[in-house]
Amino acid sequence: MIPPQEASARRREIEDKLKQEEETLSFIRDSLEKSDQLTKNMVSILSSFESRLMKLENSIIPVHKQTENLQRLQENVEKTLSCLDHVISYYHVASDTEKIIREGPTGRLEEYLGSMAKIQKAVEYFQDNSPDSPELNKVKLLFERGKEALESEFRSLMTRHSKVVSPVLILDLISGDDDLEAQEDVTLEHLPESVLQDVIRISRWLVEYGRNQDFMNVYYQIRSSQLDRSIKGLKEHFHKSSSSSGVPYSPAIPNKRKDTPTKKPVKRPGTIRKAQNLLKQYSQHGLDGKKGGSNLIPLEGLLPCTPRGGLPGPWINAACVCAADISPGHEHDFRVKHLSEALNDKHGPLAGRDDMLDVETDAYIHCVSAFVKLAQSEYQLLADIIPEHHQKKTFDSLIQDALDGLMLEGENIVSAARKAIVRHDFSTVLTVFPILRHLKQTKPEFDQVLQGTAASTKNKLPGLITSMETIGAKALEDFADNIKNDPDKEYNMPKDGTVHELTSNAILFLQQLLDFQETAGAMLASQETSSSATSYSSEFSKRLLSTYICKVLGNLQLNLLSKSKVYEDPALSAIFLHNNYNYILKSLEKSELIQLVAVTQKTAERSYREHIEQQIQTYQRSWLKVTDYIAEKNLPVFQPGVKLRDKERQIIKERFKGFNDGLEELCKIQKAWAIPDTEQRDRIRQAQKTIVKETYGAFLQKFGSVPFTKNPEKYIKYGVEQVGDMIDRLFDTSA
C-alpha cells in the first residue's frame, strides 16, 4: 500500500505532464490551421498566374509564327536572286573572258587560268542544266581555244627555254663525283625557276581539266632532242679540242675562259697505240741505241706514264718518259726533249688514226657518263612536270634517242673490233677494254636511272656489255693463236739477232692488259662459264687471266724457237733467243706480269733464267772453233830444248793462223750482232774474254818464244790484252 504522501505527489506530477501535453497539442493544432490557410492562398495565386499565362500565350504565338514565315520568305527571295545572278553570270562568261583567251596566257598565266576556270564552270552548268543552249557551244568552243593556247604556251616555254647543256658544264658535272676537293655541287638548271613554275601549273591544269596527254609527247620530244644534242655536243667538243690542242681541255691554264671546265677533268682510259707503228716511227727517225743497241726502244720506255690503276691517255707521251722509266739493262740514247722535237719537226704532232681512236674512245666513255648524269637530271625535272603515273613511260620515251645513239656507237665499236681481229690488228681491239670496264662500272647507275622503264630499254646496256665481252674474248683467243702461228719470214728477222717485233708486240699487249685485269678476266670467264661476268669470283677470273698469259708466253716461246731456225749461224740463233728471252723476263719483272704469271706458273721466272743460260752456253760453243786451235788438249807434245822439226813448226803456224783467222772472223761477224741489255752484254763479253784470254795466254806463253818461224809477227799478231779488247768490241757496231 502506497503511502498517501507519495500518491499525492505522483498525482501532481501526472497532472503537470498532462497539462504540458495539452499545451503542445494546442500549439500543433494552431500551426496546422495556419498551414492550411497558406496553402489555400498559394493555390489561389498559382491559379491566377496560370490563367494570365494562357491569355498571354494565346496572343504571342500567332505573332511569332507570322514573323518566322516572313523571314523564310525573305531568305527564299534572296537565294532566288543569288541563283539568278549566278545563272546570268554564266551567260556573260564568254563575253567577259573572250579577250583574255584571245590574247593568250603569255605573261598573264594566273589571270588566264582564272578565266579558264570560269569557262570550265560555265560549260559544266550548261551541260547539266541547258544542254541545248547555244551558249553551251559558245563556251565549249572558247574552252577548246583556251586549252589549245595553253598547250601552245607549254610548247613555247619548253622550246624557248630548253637549252643544250654545254660540254664544259657536263664535264664539271661528271668530275663532281671524283673531285674530292669540290666545295660545291654542280647543278643543272634546265629551265629558269619562274618558267618552271609556269610549266608545272600548265601541266597540272592540262591533266586535271584538259584531259589531254599530248603535252607529255611534246615534253619528251623537246627534252629528248636537248638530251641527244647535249651528248653529241660533248662528243664534238672532244673532236674539236683534240684537233686544236690534242686534249679536251687543260686545267693547268690559269686564266679560266668560258669554255674551260671549273673542275679537274675526269681521268678516263684512252686506247693504246699500236706497237708496230711506234717501232716503225722510231726506226724511221733513226733513234738507234748506243753500244749493242738496236732500233728497238725498250718496252719500259713505251709504257703509259700514268701509274698502275690510272687511266692512260696516248700510248706514248714523250714528255712523260724519263730515265727512270727505262730499264737499267737497256742503254739507249733517249732524250725526251730531242725526241719530241725531232718527231714534231719532221713529221708533225702524232695525230694519226690511233690518236683518233683515243679521242673516239675517251669521247664515248665521257658520253656514257654524261648520259647517266643528264638522264638523272632529266628525271628530276620530269618528276615536277609530268603526273606520277605517266613519269616512267614519258622518261622511257625521252631517253630513247640518246640511249640508242650510245648503243649504236657501242655496236659500231664492236663491229670495228671484229674487223680489226680479222686484220690481226689486236692493238685496235684494245679500245674495247677501257670502254667495257667503264660500262660495267657505270652499270649500277644505269640500272638505277632506267628503273621502271621498259624491259627492252633496260636490256640494251647488258646486251652491249655481252657483245663487248664476246668480241674481247675472241680477240684474246685469236691473239694467242696469232702469236703461235706468226710465219717465219727471213726478211722480217732482225739481222743483228735483237728482240723480234713479235716479242715486243706480244709483251706490250700483255702489259696493256694489266690496266684491265678485271675486264680481261671477265671476258675469259664469260666464255668459260657461258654466263655474265657477275657469276664468277675475282680469284677465278685472275687465274683465267694468268692461264691465258702463260698460254701466250708459251706460244711466243714456240714461235721464237721456230723463227730462230731461220738463222744459218747457230750462234746468232742463240743470241736471238737470248735477247728475246731476256727481254721477256725483264719486261715481266718490270711490270706486274710476273706476279700474275706466278698465280698459275710458280717456276716461270726460274724457267726463263734457265733458258737464257742455255742460250749463252750455246753461243759460247761458237768460240770452240777458235779456242780449239790453241787448246792444251789439241797441242802436240814438244821436248824442251830440242830443235823443232818442220812438221812441228808447221803445226804451230797452223795453230796461230787458225786462231787469228777464227778470232778475226768471229769478231767481224759478231760485232754487228746486238745485245741491248748492257748487263747481259757485259757479262757475256767478260765470260768469253776470260776463257779466250786464259787459253790464248797459256798458248802464247808456251809457244811465243819458240822459234817456229823467221817472221813471228806474221803469226803472233795479237797480244793477250789485244784479244781482250777485240772481244770487248763484240756487239758494238760503232766500235
Swiss-Prot record:
Membrane topology: Peripheral membrane protein
Xref: SUPFAM superfamilies: Cullin repeat-like
GO molecular function terms attached to this record: phosphatidylinositol-4,5-bisphosphate binding; protein-macromolecule adaptor activity
Tissue expression as described in the entry: Abundant in the ventricular zone, the outer subventricular zone and the cortical plate of the fetal cortex.
GO process terms (BP): exocytosis; membrane fission; mitotic cytokinesis; positive regulation of mitotic cytokinetic process; protein transmembrane transport; regulation of entry of bacterium into host cell; regulation of macroautophagy; vesicle docking involved in exocytosis
CC annotations in GO: centriolar satellite; cytosol; exocyst; Flemming body; growth cone membrane; membrane; microtubule organizing center; midbody
Coiled coil segments of this chain: 5-42, 63-85
Alphabetized UniProt keyword annotations: Cell membrane, Coiled coil, Cytoplasm, Epilepsy, Exocytosis, Membrane, Phosphoprotein, Protein transport, Transport
UniProt region (Disordered), positions on chain: 239-268
Residues spanning the membrane: none
Phosphoserine PTM sites in chain numbering: 133
Location within or outside the cell: Cytoplasm, Cytosol; Cell membrane; Midbody, Midbody ring
Main localization category: cytoplasm
Phosphoprotein keyword on record: yes
Heme keyword on record: no
Quaternary assembly: The exocyst complex is composed of EXOC1, EXOC2, EXOC3, EXOC4, EXOC5, EXOC6, EXOC7 and EXOC8. Interacts with ARHQ in a GTP-dependent manner. Interacts with RAB11FIP3.
Function: Component of the exocyst complex involved in the docking of exocytic vesicles with fusion sites on the plasma membrane. In adipocytes, plays a crucial role in targeting SLC2A4 vesicle to the plasma membrane in response to insulin, perhaps directing the vesicle to the precise site of fusion. It is required for neuron survival and plays an essential role in cortical development.
Associated pathology: Neurodevelopmental disorder with seizures and brain atrophy: An autosomal recessive disorder characterized by brain atrophy, seizures, and developmental delay. Disease severity is variable. Severely affected individuals develop symptoms in utero, which may lead to spontaneous abortion. Patients at the mildest end of the phenotypic spectrum have onset of seizures later in childhood and show developmental delay with mildly impaired intellectual development and minimal brain atrophy.
Domain notes: The N-terminus is involved in SEC8 and ARHQ binding. The C-terminus is required for translocation to the plasma membrane.
Family label: Belongs to the EXO70 family.
Official protein name in the record: Exocyst complex component 7
